[in-house]
Structures are given as C-alpha cells and as structure tokens.
Design a protein with these regions (language model features):
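Short, low-hydrophobicity acidic/polar segments
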Residues: 1-145, 171, 177-192, 227-229, ...
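Short aromatic-acidic-glycine turn motif
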Residues: 142-155
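Pro/Thr/Gly/Ala/Ser-biased low-complexity repeat segments characteristic
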Residues: 163-171
C-alpha cells in the first residue's frame, strides 16, 4: 500500500487512554487461522506533508524531506508565545515478521526504530583568558535535505538511504536571530547550548569546506560549513565585530550521520574564517559525541 488518501491503503492504529486500537472500527482485521504466519510493517506517524511511504511485497520505502523549522519565518505568536508553524517529524518504522495468532496471544508487538539523525550544537571558548563570544545566530549549510529510506532486513543504516540530490546552500537555522536572545560564551562556562532545539537530518556524510577557498566555492562544491553571526571580545576590546555590530564567521564542518543516533557537537571558539577563507584568530575546533537516540521531550532535552 501507500499513504495516498485518508485511508492510507493500510490500517490506521491510534492510542487512546493508553490503549492501541483501530482508529476506524470498519478497518478491523482477523487472523486467517491460528497458525498462519503473517508479516507486519508499521510507520509512525502515518504521514504528513514532509514524508510519505510506499510498501509492496518486494520493497518498503519511506520518503522524507527535512524542513528549516527554526527559521524566523516559521514562527508565529500565539498567546504571547513564539511557536513554530511547521516542525520536522521523528519518523519511525517497525517490522514484525512471521507472526501468528499464538505468538503474542493475538497481539502484534512492534519495536520502532528511527530513520533520521538528531543533531544539537553547543559552544565554549578555547583559551584561558577573558575571551567572550556573543552569538546572535547560527546556521548549517550544504547538506542533502531529503531522500528515500528502504526498510532493511537488519538494523537501519546510512546505506539504506537514497538521497534526492537536493543540496541546501542557503542553510538551515541552528539558532535564529531573536532580540534579547543572544548567547554569551566564556571560558568559565561549561559548554552552552546554542541550538534552538534538536535538529533532524537525513543520515548522510558531509564533506567539510576546504579552506582557504571561498564560501562561494564551497557552495559550488557542496562543501559543508557553519555560519556564526557573533562578536568576539577579549580584555574589553573587540577582536571581531563591535559593540554595535555582529559579523559573520564561517567554520568548516564534516559529519557522518547514522539513523537513530543523536550527535552533539561542541564548538570550541578560538577563531574561524571570513567568507573569503581568511583566518580570524585561530580555527574553531570541534568535540563530537554520539548517543543512541533517547526519547525525551524536545523542549527539555538533557544533553
């Protein structure tokens, strides 16, 4: 089946009061016999404007396109609170093969697996001095925004994705510009969160920007980087930007994202590059950590 139409050409199962049941009673299905083996496939959630699925006997596919959910234009004010209009979807799938009526007393048990990668960013300074970095905005550039995931026999892997070839040089927002919401990072701080929230990406490898080439050349070559709009101050004097101006600093970025993993990148500030690839102070370094994806509310992610 596929997800065309409200019926989804499949069976819609929903949870009410802690119990899973048929959303539409007319969709109820019965076991043919007590010992007939059946294979079951599930996708959660069913579908939306950013992803779809198509299952046949020979192939089971889920197509997904990422959305720049933290961009300023995606937010609206509701009851005095800035809320997103659209958000990315944590798409999961589950497979239960060779099930009979006797396997689990007539119930089909699913263990869902994530098909996307989750990414968050933190920042800290490098030097043992009074350097202060004032961050106004952050974005990530040059990655594939979507593709098709083929459900594998084993565990999900990056190789199960066929990317759609649509690169994103204009970038996705990590931290949007908000008045009074700039982030100040000093050596005395532990690494500070600089993401507006966890980001979801199609699993893929990113090739970092090859400095000293320009940002324009990086976009042509589809090389990845972070753009950080910030000020850098030491001893009361501005090394980058000014009291009244934030400036753009660029950082080469590489990644190897796998499905179902959460990646935590800590930017260690000591400098970076301008748009022409010229160094500003010293290059920013990275510390990276990866965790199995933990089911935590997006508004309260313990990193």
């Amino acid at each position: 089946g596929n997800d065309s139409g409200l019926a989804n050409n499949g069976i819609n199962i929903s949870c009410k009061s802690g119990n899973w049941s048929y959303t539409n009673p007319s969709d109820i299905r019965y076991w043919p016999t007590t010992d007939t083996k059946l294979n079951f496939y599930a996708v959660n959630p069913g579908s939306n404007r950013f992803f779809s699925w198509k299952f046949s006997n020979s192939k089971k596919e889920i197509s997904y396109v990422c959305f720049n959910e933290y961009q300023t234009s995606n937010f609206t004010i509701e009851n005095g609170v800035n809320k997103p209009i659209h958000t990315n979807t944590d798409v999961m799938y589950a497979v239960a093969k060779d099930q009979t009526h006797e396997t689990n007393k007539g119930k089909v048990k699913f263990k869902f697996k994530h098909i996307l990668s989750q990414v968050v960013f933190k920042a800290k300074t490098q030097y043992d001095n009074d350097m202060e970095v004032d961050i106004n905005a952050v974005s990530i550039h040059n990655f594939q925004i979507g593709g098709t995931f083929t459900i594998p026999e084993g565990e999900p892997a990056q190789s199960n994705w066929t990317l759609n070839g649509k690169n994103q040089p204009s970038g996705f927002t990590v931290k949007k510009v908000e008045e009074g919401k700039n982030i100040k990072v000093t050596l005395s701080d532990n690494a500070k969160d600089i993401s507006d929230g966890p980001m979801l990406f199609v699993p893929q490898k990113l090739t970092k920007w090859a400095v000293p080439s320009t940002i324009a050349a990086a976009n042509t070559a589809k090389q990845s980087y972070l753009k950080i709009t910030c000020k850098i101050k030491q001893g009361g004097a501005f090394l980058f930007g000014s009291n009244t101006e934030y400036k753009d600093l660029y950082v080469p970025f590489e990644a190897d994202w796998q499905p179902g993993k959460r990646y935590i990148y800590t930017l260690i500030f000591g400098g970076g590059y301008d748009a022409d690839g010229n160094p500003i102070l010293q290059p920013i370094n990275f510390e990276a950590a990866v965790d199995d994806w933990k089911e935590e509310p997006e508004s309260n992610v313990d990193l």
